[in-house]
Amino acid sequence: MKEATITPFAKPLYIMTKPVGAVCNLACDYCYYLEKSKLYEEQPRHVMSDELLEKFIKEYIQSQTMPQVLFTWHGGETLMRPLVFYKKALELQKKYAGGRTIDNCIQTNGTLLTDEWCEFFRENNFLVGISIDGPQEFHDEYRKNKMGQPSFYKVMKGINLLKKHGVEWNAMAVVNDYNADYPLDFYRFFRDELDCHYIQFTPIVERLSNRADGLRLSSLKQKDGELASFSITPEQWGNFLCTIFDEWVLN
């Protein structure tokens, strides 16, 4: 692959990398990845091999036309790949950097974080995104493990480890039918209890299908399917954002 030329007016190319595919230690009710395993039951191809990792890193860097390159690691649950995988990724980034500045961000549910993981993230300047749906009563409604056990306390333990090691982190929160009507409780938890400076809110709207293969969630093209019970309405989403905006401006 011919290496791209760095230009001052170019736009960056971003690719979200999923080194474990849909594999996760949680089974959140609203997750659109819960059914992905059925797509590769006969021939699993969802875990990135070392060969594919090197090919991807080399070609991704060479395709960039800007001096900064951002790698975004996403899941499934990213920390279900061992630490050695990400150490290998950094080695390959250095090998193919070609004078470019390389940055990394990673999204995780936070339940598998340890001191060792956090030390690695801090030493290598990773930005860590934590998936957490607000206070315990909101978070644990849908974000449970595969045995139906709540995950809030493990996530909080992970956040405290990030703070302990001085890792830069932010939050990604799903707005669903259970928490959408409590925007101030939601927002103040992140601001006052977590001291979180950056929050991404994601509204959940999913349609159901009655497919013969047992898959529940419908495609984007199917616009007349029944809404999943955890979905929010346009009115809820608008009120949620406006209420938080007013609180943010005033306080």
Predicted regions and their residues:
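Hydrophobic faces of well-ordered beta-strands that scaffold small-molecule active sites
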Residues: 15, 69-71, 104-106, 128-130, ...
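Conserved alpha-helical substructure of the radical SAM core
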Residues: 2-119, 123-124
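Alpha-helix N-cap and loop-to-helix initiation/capping positions
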Residues: 44-51, 81-84, 143-150, 232-239
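Conserved radical SAM core fold
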Residues: 37-39, 76-80, 110-115, 127-148, ...
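A generic secondary-structure signal
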Residues: 55, 59-63, 92-95, 158-161, ...
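Radical SAM enzyme [4Fe-4S]-AdoMet core and its adjacent flexible, acidic
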Residues: 146-153, 160, 164-251
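Short, surface-exposed basic-aromatic patches at helix termini and helix-loop junctions that form
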Residues: 91, 118-125, 147, 188-194
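Short coil-to-beta-strand
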Residues: 24-32, 125-130, 194-201
